[in-house]
């Protein structure tokens, strides 16, 4: 069931599990018969979980978490912090703030192998919900009953434009929908009563390059600005503050390894 939900396709799920599509279909049908529910429905050629299917899926996830917890407990000796851990982070935090924590974790726990995946905040939330990553860090507060979120760092949003250029506020480089930064960029434009032509770019470094070239302006996290940026760009404070949040699935089993990793992620994030 979990693989079908991830793949959004019986055929793709079968390929991922190295089995046949009819076998997957029989397994889902068996679930429906056992629990007397309809698991999936199709709307406009898109497969989605029914309300009963969503409940069943959450129970399956919880069971998987418990099985994973049991296996980890049985393998854990002397609270050793070892093995693999999957960390999902928003682009801004991952590219500009995460290196210090990763370095510290590598020094403290050389047997721990952390696999980092960077994406926008919405995607990281979905990966947490579907148990694709163990821990997530996002750029906005999450309103979801399946997610536990804890603020771990404060951030400041600023407007940037090239110092030497005329006040070009006609073109704004902005992040894609789903990015935590996008929400605050829109708030900043509203606050300044600006209605510029928007160019969507899903990479902050490229956005800054466009601003350095004098092609327009942007609204970004102050933590993304280097000393070179501060020297060449005009930085205007917008009095917009936000937090970065550490997120976990509410049913995630927090073993000793997770506790120690989370503790380090909450430290030295400025």
UniProtKB/Swiss-Prot annotation:
Domain of life of the native organism? Bacteria
The record places domain HTH lysR-type at 1-50
Q: Where is the signal peptide?
A: none
Q: What InterPro entries does the annotation carry?
A: LysR_subst-bd, Tscrpt_reg_HTH_LysR, WH-like_DNA-bd_sf, WH_DNA-bd_sf
Gene3D superfamilies assigned: Periplasmic binding protein-like II, Winged helix-like DNA-binding domain superfamily/Winged helix DNA-binding domain
Known DNA-binding region: 10-29
UniProtKB keywords: DNA-binding, Transcription, Transcription regulation
Pfam families attached here?
A: HTH_1 (PF00126), LysR_substrate (PF03466)
Q: What GO molecular function annotation could you give as one example from this UniProt entry?
A: transcription cis-regulatory region binding
Q: Which PANTHER family match?
A: HTH-TYPE TRANSCRIPTIONAL REGULATOR (PTHR30126), HTH-TYPE TRANSCRIPTIONAL REGULATOR CYSL (PTHR30126:SF39)
Give the UniProt family note.
Belongs to the LysR transcriptional regulatory family.
Name of the protein: Uncharacterized HTH-type transcriptional regulator in lacR 5'region
């Amino acid at each position: 069931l979990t693989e079908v939900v991830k793949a959004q396709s019986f055929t793709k799920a079968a390929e991922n599990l190295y089995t046949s599509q009819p076998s997957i279909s029989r397994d889902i049908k068996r679930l429906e018969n056992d629990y007397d529910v309809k698991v999936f429905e199709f709307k406009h050629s898109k497969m989605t979980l029914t309300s009963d299917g969503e409940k069943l899926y959450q129970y399956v996830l919880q069971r998987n978490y418990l099985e994973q917890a049991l296996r980890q407990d049985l393998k854990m000796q002397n609270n050793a912090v070892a093995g693999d851990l999957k960390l999902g982070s928003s682009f801004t935090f991952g590219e500009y703030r995460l290196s210090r924590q990763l370095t510290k974790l590598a020094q403290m726990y050389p047997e721990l192998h952390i696999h980092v995946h960077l994406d926008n905040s919405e995607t990281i939330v979905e990966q947490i919900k579907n148990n694709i990553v163990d821990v997530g860090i996002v750029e906005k507060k999450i309103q979801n009953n399946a997610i536990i979120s804890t603020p771990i760092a404060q951030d400041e949003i600023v407007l940037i434009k090239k110092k030497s250029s005329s006040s070009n506020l006609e073109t704004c480089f902005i992040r894609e929908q789903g990015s935590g930064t996008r929400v605050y960029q829109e708030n900043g434009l509203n606050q300044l009563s600006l209605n510029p032509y928007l160019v969507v770019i899903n990479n902050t470094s490229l956005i800054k390059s466009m601003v350095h070239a004098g092609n327009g302006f942007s609204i970004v996290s102050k933590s993304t600005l280097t000393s070179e940026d501060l020297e060449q760009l005009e930085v205007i404070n917008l009095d917009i503050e936000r937090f970065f949040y550490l997120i976990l699935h509410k049913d995630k089993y927090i073993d000793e390894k997770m506790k120690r990793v989370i503790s380090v992620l909450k430290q030295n994030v400025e």
